[in-house]
Amino acid sequence: FLLSLYHTFPKLQGKRLWLAGESYAGKFIPYMADWIYKHEAENQRAGIHLHGINMIDGFFMDDIIGKELPSMQFAQQHYRSMNISEADMSALEAKAQKIGIADYVEKYLHYPPKGPLPVPRGLNKSESVYSAFKKLAKKANPCFSPFYVIATAPCPLNSMGQNVTSEKAFPHNYFNDMPSIKPIIHADNKTYLSCSRAKPFKIMKKLHTQFPIHTVLPGVIEKSNRTIIQHGKLDYIMLVNGTSLAIQNMTWAGAQGFQSKPNKTLLVDGETAGLYHSERKLSLVQVDRASHMIAAYKPKPAYKLLQFLLGQIEEEDLIKA
């Protein structure tokens, strides 16, 4: 597809290419980048010049690291703002103690890491703290959104036809409801959804495709000029410290994880917008009060990070207003 695209639109040839995406794209983008790097000669002849990748709240790791292991810490940090009762939290803490994740993040999220992350023996799907906290949140707030945990009523569809409380996509969106759009861009006259109703990870599982953190992501980071991993702190689809744990469990460029803790302040319009850290061509950015969809809820930090990805600003500019 990419070779055909560059052949059809020759003005793209020779321009810098960056791959960026959110959520599911965290599994796909590293494999796409790896394919491009592995076919460098062919792509160079076609004018394709990949410079790096950007993953936003991405699934580049499995659910155990991304969701389960940091779930109790997330619950402790946010249950009051989500109106979850102390009694419910006590029951959740007992469950976390039983399966061995009550203080997992505090024990194992180190800079530099002390070795590969252990998986508690008691961890199992039937005792999921992640799922239990999600149910408590829904009980406390019928409009609870795992995309943005402090969302409140009303809970309508957004312009893309996404009901963020149910994690389902619906056909009532601007693309389908405005018949003039599809002909303008030569799109087929069919119904489009903002997110597939199919389960792409199940499809990839059948193909025996592993999450890229275990396979191609380290090499992609090493070959790229810049790799950025962003995460919104109020996302419960994939947890911010799940991303941190995953990075600390990954080896690239001769070392495991970051050697220093992320502590640099991301500034936007003179205000703190999050934390960031860069080592060995990988940058992690944790965006304050941002959802799973950072650009939708925090467009100014998202735009500044896009400028950083494209090289329009340097890393030291992230701390400048």
For the regions a language model picked out, list residue spans one by one:
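Terminal and linker regions of secretory-pathway proteins
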Residues: 1-321
